[in-house]
């Protein structure tokens, strides 16, 4: 059973956002006291964390499907939904995150580094949050958006100071076991090592790590013999140690020809931008297996040629431990120089952002030909998110969506694109929301006499105070008294009489008139 996995595909599903709530507060003597629908909670993200204690991706090889929790729905009385718990996935330091198409998203090269691999959905707003001075009682709420669902590829690139490279069965694993406390698998057949082995070497006051890279053969840079998978682990090493087998019995092989083939493969391997090419890094040569008499003679024969090329050459034996101390100190010097150079040229902190399309406009309109005429497709982050948040069973919510799209300029864009009333409009790629477009000017929107969501039943009620009632009462009494006084003055002046003919003083006006005649 495999115990080391350096490549795995994760199937991620981030949590969805909770839906907003539609609710109206009820109080004593005031059954419609305003909106109080809470917002939905955001879903949980899926975050990758670079953990130095993790050395393999085996856990994700066995369980590649990972999902986080959804956000809770909003409730009445301004109660917001619960937040979905963030799911943290520890990965080894040196893990490269790629999308399904092979594009690099993040390089987890620093311990503790965090990367949001799957972004959660947003919670929808409740009708309390949608209420404004013009829309006092919204009868709708926004739905929560869906979280990211897709695949990401994790590739582990071992982080070590020194990489041991060479042909299979050259003694690389034996060298790691001899100079460190690592216990790799060692056998007398090629490709015993199928995954990198790390060992920590302590020399005087120096401490560094060495990586036993599986054996390389001719054509490794083209993928022959799993070469691409092995060479990937050499990218992050600051120095190279060529382990050459001086006791090989294979025909046509010798330390010099083995070195030339390995150098050719290292030169052909492309490194990421910003990294030093493999052959420009410090290199040492170890002539191994000199405990065999014929191997010692061959090492003495090829040493002058290798030194003439500018290499420092060490004769070693992992069996008798000859030359290992000198080699360990030499590697420590290379690592120390590399660390000093890196400290003199500090790299700016790498900020990892999830790649998103950046458009000059908030949306674009594309005209696609169809069997029933042109289809106008609206593509943009905001319009597509607004469509996800709309409950199309609620006419008021659909009207709110139309208002938002018109305010964003979608209607003007459709006019410019040549759309007319009745044209098919699609929002989003693929099987998006399709509807027959009806311009606002020709729809019933202009017949609405009040803003969407206005409800006179929940308007604030203004009650008169006792002082206002007293002032109103006294004003009415004063008006009545003045009216009586006016009637008395008119009666005394003879401008009017009662029904029985009696004037204001009680005399019969007709009799008085006859007597005067």
Swiss-Prot record:
Keywords: Cytoplasm, GTP-binding, Hydrolase, Magnesium, Metal-binding, Nucleotide-binding. Residues 355-439 form the OCT domain. The keyword Metal-binding applies. Pfam families: DUF1967, GTP1_OBG, MMR_HSR1. Residues 2-159 form the Obg domain. Residues 490-517 are annotated as: Disordered. GO terms for biological process: ribosome biogenesis. Transmembrane segments: none annotated. Gene3D superfamilies: GTP-binding protein OBG, C-terminal domain, GTP1/OBG domain, P-loop containing nucleotide triphosphate hydrolases. This is GTPase Obg. GO terms for molecular function: GTP binding; GTPase activity; magnesium ion binding. It is an enzyme of class 3 (hydrolase). It comes from the Bacteria. GO terms for cellular component: cytoplasm. An essential GTPase which binds GTP, GDP and possibly (p)ppGpp with moderate affinity, with high nucleotide exchange rates and a fairly low GTP hydrolysis rate. Plays a role in control of the cell cycle, stress response, ribosome biogenesis and in those bacteria that undergo differentiation, in morphogenesis control. Mg(2+) binds at residues 173, 193. Its cofactor is Mg(2+). It is found in: Cytoplasm. InterPro entries: G_OBG (IPR031167), GTP-bd (IPR006073), GTP-bd_Obg/CgtA (IPR014100), GTP-bd_prot_GTP1/OBG_C_sf (IPR036346), GTP1-OBG_CS (IPR006074), GTP1_OBG_dom (IPR006169), GTP1_OBG_dom_sf (IPR036726), OBG_GTPase (IPR045086). Monomer. It comes from Clavibacter sepedonicus. Residues 160-336 form the OBG-type G domain. GTP binds at residues 166-173, 191-195, 212-215, 288-291, 317-319. Belongs to the TRAFAC class OBG-HflX-like GTPase superfamily. OBG GTPase family. Its EC number is 3.6.5.-. Its main location: cytoplasm.
